[in-house]
């Protein structure tokens, strides 16, 4: 097998298109143990996600975890599954469709979406953009805060997918948008709207996905970017520091992770007499297992069970128009001159094609 793939013949005078690929983490195709096993195997085999030496980790993963965890995880997914499928896939697809609608008048832009793990695969969607004539691709990892285990993993996967292409596209990545004014503004608006309907809580808890503490110690900026997001959001809401709490959820294994942990924090608040807490997850732009099941179900039960009176979960941004506006602005800013340059006219393209054919070009 050839190391580099054979490309379609280059056609002179063709339109140069820009591809925009939104990439989120991933989801199984069904809430079943059979579907969870390959998904978890791909996810937990990524050395960006689990930094334990392969010789130690892979036997544990394949011999123990993949024989026990899929069934437990399937039950959790089943509790949030919708008629349209996984909430994360549904929201990510809708976000891509809404961004595509913003560029509907342009023949030189294509918008699509993929998942880092599971389907639709990054490789398949990059191939589709190539087939559509995209010679420039902006990859948008849908993680507001950069982490090596999320954003960098998307970058790794794109590089892996392109290693066999002969005719490579221009590439750009959105590294993070944790302090983007539009993103912060949309978060603040979602909180204000919730409080207009339900009143204000005693505490607002912002729960971010956790990471092992050693990632912070080894220079990962994720922890700092989470706290910057929280500070900017609290300032936008005009909240005193004592009313805002930052915590980290989804701890896995026995290693020390970023602290404080979300569920124990909620239980402690209830025991200390905090009657109502509102929880939001600014690190997720789409509702998913970690928000709908872990926070809105498990953590709700833990808080109320510890003596809390009222628990409110404020949904992720999902398809909020102000968030889609912010995402569009970010895409346009990161794509830059790809979208602002004046494309050649039909006459100019035909002239270029004519010159190439006169010099002996086949297409």
Swiss-Prot record:
Catalyzes the ferrous insertion into protoporphyrin IX. GO terms for cellular component: cytoplasm. Signal peptide: none annotated. PANTHER family: FERROCHELATASE (PTHR11108), FERROCHELATASE, MITOCHONDRIAL (PTHR11108:SF1). Fe cation binds at residues 209, 290. This is Ferrochelatase. GO terms for biological process: heme biosynthetic process.
């Amino acid at each position: 097998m050839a190391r580099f793939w054979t490309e379609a013949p280059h056609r002179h005078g063709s339109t140069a298109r820009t591809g925009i690929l939104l990439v989120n983490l991933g989801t199984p195709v069904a809430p079943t143990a059979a579907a969870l096993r390959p998904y978890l195997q791909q996810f937990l085999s990524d050395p960006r996600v689990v930094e334990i030496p392969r010789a130690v980790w892979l036997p544990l993963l394949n011999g123990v975890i993949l024989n026990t965890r899929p069934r437990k995880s399937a039950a959790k997914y089943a509790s949030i599954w919708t008629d349209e499928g996984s909430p994360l896939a549904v929201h990510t697809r809708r976000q891509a469709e809404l961004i595509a609608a913003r560029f509907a008048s342009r023949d030189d832009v294509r918008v699509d979406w993929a998942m880092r793990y599971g389907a639709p695969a990054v490789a398949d969607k990059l191939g589709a953009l190539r087939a559509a004539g995209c010679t420039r691709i902006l990859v948008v990892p849908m993680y507001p805060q950069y982490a090596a285990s999320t954003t960098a993993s998307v970058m790794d996967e794109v590089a892996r997918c392109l290693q066999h292409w002969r005719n490579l596209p221009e590439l750009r990545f959105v590294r993070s948008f944790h302090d983007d004014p539009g993103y912060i503004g949309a978060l603040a608006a979602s909180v204000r709207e919730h409080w207009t309907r339900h009143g204000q809580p005693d505490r607002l808890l912002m729960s971010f996905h956790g990471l092992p503490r050693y990632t912070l110690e080894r220079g990962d900026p994720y922890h700092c970017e989470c706290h910057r997001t929280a500070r900017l959001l609290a300032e936008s809401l005009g909240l005193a520091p004592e009313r805002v709490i930052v915590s980290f959820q989804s701890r896995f294994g026995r290693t020390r992770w970023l602290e404080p942990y979300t569920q124990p924090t909620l239980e402690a608040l209830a025991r200390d007499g905090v009657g109502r807490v509102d929880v939001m997850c600014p690190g997720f732009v789409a509702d998913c297992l970690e928000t709908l099941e872990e926070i809105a179900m498990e953590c709700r039960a833990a808080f109320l069970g510890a003596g809390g009176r009222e628990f409110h979960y404020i949904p992720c941004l999902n398809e909020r128009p102000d968030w889609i506006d912010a995402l569009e602005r970010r895409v346009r800013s990161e794509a830059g001159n790809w979208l602002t340059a004046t494309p050649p006219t039909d006459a100019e393209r035909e002239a270029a094609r004519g010159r190439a054919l006169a010099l002996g070009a086949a297409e």
